[in-house]
Amino acid sequence: MFLSTILMTLAAAIAFAEPVLKDGWDAKQAGDKVMAGMIKVSAAQVKGAHDADLALVGDRAYVVEHDNDIKPGHGAGNAQYCVLTVINLKSMQVERVIPMAKSAEAFANVKLPSGACFVPRVIRLDEHTHRSYVACADQSGRRQSQTWYRDFDLRLQAFSPDIHRVKLRTADGTFDMEPRYFHADAAKQGFQEPAKAFGLYLLDSFKQIDGRTLLAINNFPGAQNALATLNEARDTIEVIGHYNEPSEARLTESSVNRLPDGTWMAICRSESGNRNYRFVTSADGKTWTRGEERPFVSKGSNSKPTFDKFDGIYYLGWQEASKIVEGHGAGRYIFNLDVSRDGTTWERKYRFESNDSFQYPTFRQHDGSVWFTVTQGKGGSTDRIMFGKLE
């Protein structure tokens, strides 16, 4: 029995040590090939678009994004609205764009307050339904923002006339999903940064691990992060554990996964210092280490990372702060996607370089393929969402 255990452990170690990529793999060439197959998702009138999510069913992709028709970027305030776009995977064409939510919109059961409709997310609810989430935020900070959900009928290809409040569960109880309750929970654990009335988003969503639906939530202006679960009813987010240290690094916009030994690891954007990514780990998801840099990610930029696992291989995506466009700074022109069997030894599988930037991608596996959305824009801004097939 003892010998058998040793042999099994040795076999696992050898498997983890095997390279993922073949000799001579060209990550830049692989990235160029992927980008050549991308299509534009955003509608013709859209001037600014950012940070999309997607769900796939059959031969359709359902992409949610926040847009504005005024200017590039995502600083148009109350003019920010959210839509769902349906894409045919066989023809690689947009079939329809369906409005989801906008400032002060009157639904059958409630009227949204005035505010930017921001950072939409989507999940498969059941055989015939998707559920989309969106934050409605008064970005002046005068009023607490709230995250809402709205259901989409796949048979009718239409949203429900209703919209509902998402709940947040902390150690103190269950509340409307407002930033103040998220902050209060962190403050009880020693978090000392000031509270912010807006900026609470479902950021890194959604991942199925051990029968649970997990995500990383974030308050961007508040530099707050936490691992959380989505309940079976898909209407309540429950905080598992916060990771915000060191506070001077202003960690934000993280992506999380679990390593082969059971350790949780998150890669976090940093808004201070050299702005390279920091990594935090946890044995139980509740108590986390202080964020630190890792040697396999250097010269990172302050932009949203990704951390996925497809068919037993980890995919770690991060923005590189290198300059490729004359007359511009480093910007968000380079995005690296590295792969690993163990989360420790990494190889570069894709290097996306684009004069129109390559930022805030989201990757989803469906029927043996990996599809993605990504934000692009002239001069490194954000004016459109693109869609493509990674592999």
Placement of each model-derived feature along the sequence:
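Active-site pocket scaffolds in enzymes
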Residues: Q359-Y360
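Bacterial N-terminal signal peptides
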Residues: S4-A13
